């Protein structure tokens, strides 16, 4: 596993029905799970959450720190494979979920739960997420108080919402409510909020998953109820290519690759279909 990134292992673990359901692959799946657990960051004093990067998971071999997107992928894999260690001696070797929650909120623009100096209560940012503590892919901006804030953006905010779901935070938790409010206030299908067309289809993909998992049927946007399932479905129909595929004109994060983006589309539509 050391030759693979934590991201690759997480995707393979959660995506392989054989690993999850077929007992012939249990040992391999448990080893993959244990590797992901071993990648949880613990800087500073060991077994204490005393650093903003503590509790998260990164690529494992690309750069030496955690980030929210890799943490989401790992949490998803660990959540759906948790039955592999239930009622076994390995149950005590699980992820430190409390530390994971601490890391997630350390990526959230929510001063009530995140005391880092960049966290902003300006409505333009409050409740949304950034990529990792101290860095936003959407850059920075002056908030209403003249302070430099790190800009929340769409796809990573849905990643934060989903991460809270896998950590089993309830819908009425103030951290979940805060990101839901930011996402509702910034709802659009024309762009990935604050990122333009970059990561647009990943934004759709995470949106459908997060809103489905938290059982959200409508969004309130500018005082009006929006049936997000219908709106997202219509946008996918409009953007579909003649050959049935989807593709982003913006190449960032491999979204010019039809197989990847079409997979995002199919999975997103499958979540929409389940909610009908």
Regions found by a protein language model. Give the residues of each.
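An alpha-helical repeat/solenoid feature that recognizes helix-turn-helix modules
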Residues: 16-17, 21-34, 38-234, 238, ...
């Amino acid at each position: 596993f050391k030759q693979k990134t934590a991201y690759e292992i997480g995707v393979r673990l959660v995506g392989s029905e054989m690993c999850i359901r077929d007992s012939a692959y249990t040992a391999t799946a448990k080893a993959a799970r244990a590797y992901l657990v071993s990648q949880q960051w613990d800087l500073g004093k060991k077994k204490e959450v005393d650093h903003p990067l503590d509790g998260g998971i990164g690529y494992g071999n690309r750069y030496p720190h955690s980030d929210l997107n890799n943490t989401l992928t790992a949490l998803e894999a660990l959540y759906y494979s948790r039955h592999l260690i239930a009622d076994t001696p390995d149950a005590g070797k699980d992820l430190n979920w409390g530390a994971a929650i601490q890391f997630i909120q350390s990526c959230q623009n929510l001063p009530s739960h995140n005391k880092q100096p960049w966290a902003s209560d300006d409505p333009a940012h409050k409740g949304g997420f950034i990529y990792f503590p101290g860095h936003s892919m959407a850059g920075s901006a002056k908030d209403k108080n003249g302070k430099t804030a790190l800009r929340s953006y769409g796809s990573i905010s849905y990643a934060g919402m989903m991460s809270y779901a896998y950590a089993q935070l309830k819908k009425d938790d103030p951290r979940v409510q805060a990101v839901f409010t930011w996402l509702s206030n910034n709802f659009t299908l024309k762009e990935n909020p604050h990122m333009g067309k970059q990561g647009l289809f990943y934004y759709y993909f995470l949106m459908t998953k997060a809103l489905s998992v938290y059982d959200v049927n409508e969004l309130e946007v500018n005082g009006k109820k929006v049936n997000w399932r219908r709106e997202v479905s219509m946008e996918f129909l409009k953007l579909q290519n003649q050959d049935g595929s989807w593709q982003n004109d913006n190449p960032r994060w491999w979204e010019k690759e039809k197989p990847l983006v079409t997979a995002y589309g199919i999975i997103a539509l499958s979540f929409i279909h389940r909610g009908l």
